[in-house]
């Protein structure tokens, strides 16, 4: 559960200032209804600029600017115990990355993306080697990331066999292997489904990887098991070539 993870990480709070992240204890809950206007942040001593509206700023970490989240009404009794995991995209002012919030929208933990491109996706808590961990996907360059309960990176890897990993799923199995999804375009005659003869089909691929070594333990291709005429999809109409005939969104074991 989220409570189990956050209990485990409490001892590592002092580590955060050294890792490019920010952490703080959540404030006491309040039943007050807040304004729907974007939060405003005051100028900070020693910081040569005033943070834009809608962006958090921290005295100890002026280099961090996660987007502020305004909660108009707290659902105190309707939500499960714990925190909210989100992965905001980079905005005009706020940074993109992985973020944990309380139910008032206060930042508990934030890890900005290390590059200027891409997005963090699919932030969640999982179990690895019997311990709670945070996992997410960084779309550029397509890396899968694991942090331990002290917010330290313990694994980072990519899809294997020359493929680029997809952001839809990263699941750690009960055997402590990684299950990931891939989309790969292969040449395909689409005349039977209303497309051109010389076109592409986007197939779904599943890989099971050894997290430590990156070795492929299992690989499954939709094109080997599901015929094109079984899809409900039609050839793409938005200027992209081919057909997205087998679209994997999640994995379950």
Model-derived features with residue positions:
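Histidine-/acidic-rich catalytic cores in large beta-rich domains
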Residues: 9-12, 16-18, 27-253
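N-terminal export leaders
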Residues: 2-7
């Amino acid at each position: 559960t989220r409570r189990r993870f956050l209990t485990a990480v409490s001892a590592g709070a002092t580590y955060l200032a050294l890792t490019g992240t920010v952490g703080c204890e959540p404030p006491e809950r309040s039943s007050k209804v807040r304004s729907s206007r974007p939060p405003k942040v005051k100028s900070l001593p020693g910081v040569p600029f005033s943070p834009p509206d809608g962006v958090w700023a921290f005295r100890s970490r002026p280099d961090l600017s996660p987007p502020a989240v305004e909660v108009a009404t707290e659902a105190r009794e309707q939500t499960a115990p714990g925190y909210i995991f989100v992965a905001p995209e980079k905005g005009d002012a706020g940074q993109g990355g992985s973020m944990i919030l309380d139910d008032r929208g206060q930042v508990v933990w934030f890890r900005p993306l290390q590059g200027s491109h891409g997005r963090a996706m699919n932030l969640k808590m999982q179990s690895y080697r019997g311990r709670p961990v945070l996992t997410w996907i960084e779309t550029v360059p397509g890396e899968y990331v694991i942090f331990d309960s002290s917010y330290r990176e313990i694994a980072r890897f990519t899809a294997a066999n020359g493929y680029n990993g997809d952001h839809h799923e990263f699941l750690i199995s009960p055997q402590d292997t990684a299950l990931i999804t891939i989309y790969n375009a292969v040449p395909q005659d689409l005349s039977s489904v209303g497309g051109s003869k010389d076109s592409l089909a986007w197939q779904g691929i599943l890989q099971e990887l050894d997290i430590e070594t990156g070795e492929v333990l299992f690989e499954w291709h939709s094109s080997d098991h599901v015929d094109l005429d079984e899809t409900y999809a039609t050839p793409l109409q938005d200027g992209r070539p081919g057909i997205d005939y087998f679209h994997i969104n999640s994995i379950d074991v």
